Curated annotation (Swiss-Prot):
Keyword Kinase: no
Organism field: Rhizobium etli (strain CIAT 652)
Protein name: Holo-[acyl-carrier-protein] synthase
Domain of life: Bacteria
Enzyme Commission (EC) number: 2.7.8.7
HAMAP family: AcpS
Residues binding Mg(2+): 8, 57
Leader sequence segment: none
Amino acid sequence: MIIGIGSDLIDIRRVEKSIERFGERFTHRCFTEIERARSDRRANRAESYAKRFAAKEACSKALGTGLAQGVFWKDMGVVNLPSGKPTMVLSGGAAVILESMLPAGHRAAIHLTITDDYPLAQAFVIIEALPESL
């Protein structure tokens, strides 16, 4: 069953300006080490960071909290499955909120799609509760 849906659309130029103005202070505050390593390898760094930023916003909306109630930027990280498909890994306050949303006997599956078409980046998150037996 679907227990959360969130989406976000961001102007990549905002992220470009934040990187130019604040550099590592911005990237280290908002992104996990895995996200930074992946984005810093890209020719289009700002697009990569913008997609991940949008994913975090979308995930926080799917959790129903936004970036509040103990949910922080680095509590949500974009990772790729072995197939290359992106998903989210939650820790800290985000993981606590997610656990509180799950019905007894269920585990979470977080579905994520991210895309960009300059100057915009978009993310869509669906949080699904699946029976632990599956």
